[in-house]
């Protein structure tokens, strides 16, 4: 079984490739999290978890959902994490999650994909994004081959920077930076409701045909990157920046 969480489509693409190659079941954690569905999942064998990197670990909402969900029959578990540059020491925490869930940890693969965290960084142009994805495809192929063969992923690097990023930075990143209040919608908003539909935490509601953000945000960037009229901004940090979602490529 392949479970994935995605903000702007990178993880969905990787998960679809893996599920297709392995002829395996593909399930969206976005849908389960949005609907509050924590019914047991009948995995019955290998489990592949695909997700973006949030502050050098897996997203907290994904970890929380997995801890609350019974994964029946799951054993060998592979993590595939996409990122804009690196995943830090996420593997340490993925291994710990497996211990907590009674799963056999089979490693963490890093896949560099186009940056989408425009609340802090710049997204690439479409042409740049296509080149990044083309470079990522062989790494996805390697991950597929390892999973198919039942092999562990090669251990990731363990530099001091990685340990600090995942251990010291991650806990303070959420309370300091993961906030929804800078989001606004301009007059070019057409009230289509796409942002409300995509938000995995139901943190966006339409009021008078305009999106209003609550306080429960994971900064997946789906709302700002999928807005069809580019009406959404994240304060001044997103002004003038390209938007990115995988389906545009």
Locate the predicted segments by residue.
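Iron-sulfur cluster-binding cysteine motifs and their immediate structural context
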Residues: 184-185, 190-218, 222-239
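A mid-sequence, solvent-exposed acidic-amphipathic segment
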Residues: 159-191, 197
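Generic structural signal for beta-strand residues in well-ordered domains
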Residues: 40-41, 70, 176, 192, ...
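FMN-binding flavodoxin-like domain, especially the glycine-rich phosphate-binding loop
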Residues: 2, 6-14, 20-32, 41-51, ...
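Generic structural motif recognizing short loop/turn segments at the entrances and edges of beta-strands
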Residues: 22-23, 179-181, 209
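Short acidic active-site motifs
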Residues: 35-37
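Active-site-proximal loop/hinge segments that shape catalytic or ion-binding/gating pockets
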Residues: 244-248
């Amino acid at each position: 079984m392949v479970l994935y969480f995605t903000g702007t489509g990178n993880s969905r693409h990787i998960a679809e490739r893996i599920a297709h190659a392995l002829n395996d079941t593909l399930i969206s954690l976005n849908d389960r999290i949005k609907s509050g569905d924590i019914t047991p999942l009948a995995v019955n064998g290998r489990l592949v978890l695909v997700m973006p990197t949030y502050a050098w670990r897996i997203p907290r909402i994904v970890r929380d959902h997995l801890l609350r969900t019974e994964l029946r029959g799951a054993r060998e578990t592979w993590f595939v994490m996409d990122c804009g540059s690196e995943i830090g020491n996420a593997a340490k925490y993925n291994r710990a999650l497996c211990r907590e869930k009674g799963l056999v940890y089979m490693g963490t693969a890093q896949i560099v994909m186009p940056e989408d965290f425009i609340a802090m960084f710049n997204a690439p142009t479409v042409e740049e994004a296509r080149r990044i994805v083309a470079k990522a495809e062989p790494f996805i192929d390697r991950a597929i081959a390892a999973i198919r063969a039942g092999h562990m992923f090669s251990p990731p690097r363990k530099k001091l920077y990685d340990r600090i990023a995942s251990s010291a930075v991650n806990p303070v990143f959420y309370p300091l930076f993961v906030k929804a209040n800078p989001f606004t919608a301009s007059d070019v908003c057409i009230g289509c409701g796409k942002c409300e539909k995509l938000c995995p935490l139901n943190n966006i509601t339409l009021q008078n045909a305009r999106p209003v953000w609550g306080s429960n945000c994971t900064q997946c960037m789906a709302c700002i990157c999928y807005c069809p009229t580019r009406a959404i901004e994240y304060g001044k940090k997103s002004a003038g920046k390209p938007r990115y979602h995988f389906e545009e490529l």
